[in-house]
A protein has these predicted regions:
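Signature of alpha-helical transmembrane segments in polytopic membrane proteins
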Residues: 1-138, 166, 274, 463
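A solvent-exposed beta-alpha-beta segment
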Residues: 2, 15, 22, 26, ...
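Membrane-cytosol interface motif
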Residues: 83-87, 138-157, 307-330, 352
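Short, glycine-rich, amphipathic interfacial segments at transmembrane boundaries or analogous
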Residues: 176-181, 238-251, 310-352, 410-429
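Glycine-rich flexible loop motifs, especially short His-Gly-Gly/GGXG/HXGH segments used as catalytic or interaction
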Residues: 187, 245-284, 308-312, 342, ...
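A hydrophobic, helix-centered structural microdomain
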Residues: 270-334, 370, 442, 447-463
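A short, structured surface patch at a secondary-structure boundary
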Residues: 343-406, 448-456
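C-terminal terminal-structure detector
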Residues: 373, 387, 394-463
Length: 463
């Protein structure tokens, strides 16, 4: 399953959390009201539906607190802290909801008792899952063919994503390297001539091919027989890496892979629906954010002389140049020598108000107008300045391909990679942009929008 979506393990975790929260509240109701009182509330007062709503609110807050990130479960102190905060926020929101809509109330006593019950159940469950997923026998067993950079990068992607459900059992080599040579957390377990026996002894579920040169000793016949017999799944490292990490590894790419693995062509109707939806959402966003925009314009004008808005040339779809609109967040002499400069962390050109509005993304509000005009979409690769595009296209392979789709207000690269100001940062972001272009869909757009909202609410900021 692509890394853009929830992995199967994460989906099971969400479902288990839902059952635990739901069951915990029901248990609290029985503790507080007894059998007869609970059955009356559940059956005659729509208690089942009320508890379902409360459970949904809790799940959303758990998501916003990154409690479906498996790395959080490895730190029990952090896990406990986040669970307490998340459940506290969830029950505060529910209290507010019950105040305005009393018919949804499940009972104050029940609410108070359910908090510690749900907290303990979730904590024990998360610790158990962490111990279980760390067991070496749990997960699909992967044998990597190759020992070069692509092979190592593929294995490291698996080691970094414990939640993906894979285990590297070892590497096989073509050049007769010494068996049992350590490579990261695993080792060389044999050569390509031993593939047949290794599949059985290591109980391999999937072979990942991570060698570029496929002449000479490459075991084409052996792999063909295995594939046709259905003994084991066989996959290119490029596709496997993409699925695990949610990005396309540029160093592994061949033009042929981009051609044959490209996304299916959208129908004209789907394109029109997407454009209408994006423009409609942008118009709604412009209306809803109007009071914030007016207030922002006033404080910008009060703080420093100069225009309220900042217009700058950017490269759009198919290389077309357009002017992006933002609230001005830098001094008017930010580029007094006329040369474009990368934005950096703690950039001293940013004004005090500018720092605040950039942190909570308010400076991006005027870009709703760019979306309405059709120059941008809600979701897509962030538009870059022509000067930097020209520079990066010379240094980074496939860079121009990010302009095959409309630029976005937010994007896959923005939620997956921290902000950067270098060629290497641009290279890393391109890998996420290519993934988005290849896998673009409504479901992926919704995931990105949801993650962006989470980022804004927790003030992780921008540049």
């Amino acid at each position: 399953m692509p890394a853009t979506r929830f992995s199967p393990r994460t989906i099971w975790l969400i479902l288990a959390d839902a059952a635990i929260i739901y069951g915990g509240i029901v248990l609290a109701m029985y503790v507080r009201l007894g059998v007869s009182g609970s059955e009356y509330q559940l059956n005659d007062r729509n208690g089942w539906e009320k508890i379902a709503l409360a459970s949904l609110v809790c799940l959303l807050i758990l998501y916003f607190y990154d409690l479906y990130d498996y790395t959080v479960m490895g730190n029990r102190r952090e896990l406990m802290l986040r669970l307490v905060q998340a459940l506290g926020i969830a029950w505060a929101l529910l209290a507010l909801l019950f105040y305005f809509v009393p018919s949804l109330l499940i009972g104050r006593g029940v609410s108070v008792i359910s908090v510690p019950i749900v907290l303990v159940l979730l904590l024990v469950w998360r610790i158990f899952i962490h111990l279980l997923t760390g067991h070496p026998e749990i997960g699909e067993k992967i044998l990597v063919v190759g020992t070069g950079k692509s092979a190592i990068d593929t294995a490291e992607a698996v080691w970094e994503r414990r939640d993906a459900g894979y285990r590297i059992v070892g590497f096989v080599t073509e050049n007769g390297a010494t068996p049992h040579t350590k490579i990261g957390e695993s080792e060389i377990v044999g050569t390509v001539d031993e593939l047949d026996s290794l599949i059985k002894t290591e109980k391999v579920d999937r072979i990942v091919i991570a060698v570029r040169e496929r002449r000479g000793t490459f075991p084409t016949e052996t792999l063909l027989k295995m594939s046709l017999a259905g003994d084991v799944n066989i996959e290119e490292c490029t596709s496997f890496f993409e699925r695990v990490t949610g990005k396309v590894h540029i160093d592994m790419l061949r033009p042929s892979w981009l051609i044959f693995a490209g996304r299916r062509r959208d129908t004209r109707l789907k394109i029109v629906i997407r454009e209408v939806a994006h423009r409609g959402l942008a118009l709604a966003g412009l209306i809803v954010s109007f009071p914030i925009a007016v207030f922002t314009a006033i404080v910008i004008k009060l703080e420093s002389k100069g225009p309220i808005f900042y217009r700058q040339e950017r490269v759009g779809k198919n290389g077309r140049i357009f002017k992006v609109i933002k609230f001005r967040s830098m001094r008017t002499d930010a580029e007094k020598d006329g040369k474009p400069v990368w934005a950096t962390a703690d950039d001293n050109r940013v004004t005090r108000i500018g720092g605040i509005i950039r942190k909570i993304r308010v400076d991006e509000i005027p870009q709703f107008w760019n979306i309405i005009k059709g120059e941008m979409s809600f979701v897509g690769p962030r538009p870059e300045r022509p000067h930097f595009v020209e520079q990066l296209a010379e240094e980074i392979l496939f860079y121009e391909h990010r302009h095959l789709t409309a630029p976005g207000l937010t994007g896959w690269a923005q939620i997956k990679y921290p902000y950067g100001a270098s060629v290497e940062d641009a290279r890393q972001k391109l890998q996420y942009d290519l993934y988005y272009i290849k896998n673009q869909s409504l479901a992926l757009d919704l995931v990105i929008i949801f993650e962006t909202v989470k980022t804004v609410l927790f003030s992780r900021g921008g540049r």
